């Protein structure tokens, strides 16, 4: 039974189950305390947007503790954009070009009209942009994590930017923290997918790929 402010819904029999119930894995994300508890109690994979390594580690620790309170174990996923080129200089130039014609006022309007503009997660993405700007680091909140893409959109607001080895190292650092699933994208999507497949995917130990 879902009994919310705007939606009242009965599902008989309930059809949402975790993967243990022989259905696809249930991915769930959210940084609010309520969202974290929902994920800890019911999700198979807790999915998060980009953040600094220290913050990601803190979130994973918190979610493990919450899940243990329900005698459960969570898996973790990471959603980010990627800009990879043969050299770091080329990757950074591609990132700069991506937003080179953006009017900051238009970017702010895009973010503010999004339905999730007041969410905990979106506020955290904004905090990272502000921190990068305050540091004068060219929108990089930490090594190879670029928040510039978030100036033109809501939601997932950072990209892993670098040469193939740097991008791989960043992904491996997340894996060492305990992240198992990655949802990656870029602009234009097909072009960045091809570049990731060319430069990074061959360096990753992975199973069979299907399209």
Region locations from a protein language model:
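Alpha-helical segments flanking ligand/cofactor-binding loops in enzyme cores
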Residues: 36-40, 172
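An alpha-helical appendage that flanks or caps ligand/catalytic pockets
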Residues: 1-19, 51-176, 205-211
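A local structural motif
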Residues: 21-25
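Glycine-rich, proline-tolerant flexible connector loops at the mouths of alpha/beta enzymes
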Residues: 50-53, 184-197
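Structural motif
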Residues: 41-42, 177
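Hydrophobic faces of well-ordered beta-strands that scaffold small-molecule active sites
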Residues: 26-29, 44-48, 74-80, 182-184
């Amino acid at each position: 039974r879902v009994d919310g402010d705007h939606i009242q819904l009965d599902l008989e029999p309930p059809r949402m189950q975790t993967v243990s119930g022989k259905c696809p894995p249930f991915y769930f994300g959210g940084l609010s305390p309520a969202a974290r508890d929902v994920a800890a109690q019911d999700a198979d994979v807790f999915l998060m947007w980009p953040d600094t390594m220290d913050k990601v580690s803190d979130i994973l620790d918190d979610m493990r503790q919450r899940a243990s309170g329900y005698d459960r174990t969570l898996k973790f996923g990471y959603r980010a954009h990627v800009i990879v080129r043969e050299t770091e200089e080329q990757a950074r130039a591609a990132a700069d070009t991506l937003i080179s014609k953006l009017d900051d006022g238009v970017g702010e309007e895009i973010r503010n009209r999004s339905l999730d503009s007041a969410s905990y997660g979106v506020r955290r993405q904004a905090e990272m942009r502000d921190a990068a700007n305050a540091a004068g680091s060219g929108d990089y909140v930490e090594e190879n994590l670029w928040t510039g893409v978030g100036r033109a959109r809501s939601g997932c607001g950072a990209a892993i930017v670098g040469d193939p080895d740097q991008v791989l190292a960043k992904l491996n650092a997340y894996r060492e923290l305990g992240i198992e699933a990655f949802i990656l994208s870029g602009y234009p999507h097909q072009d960045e997918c091809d570049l990731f497949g060319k430069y990074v995917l061959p360096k990753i130990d992975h199973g069979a790929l299907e399209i």
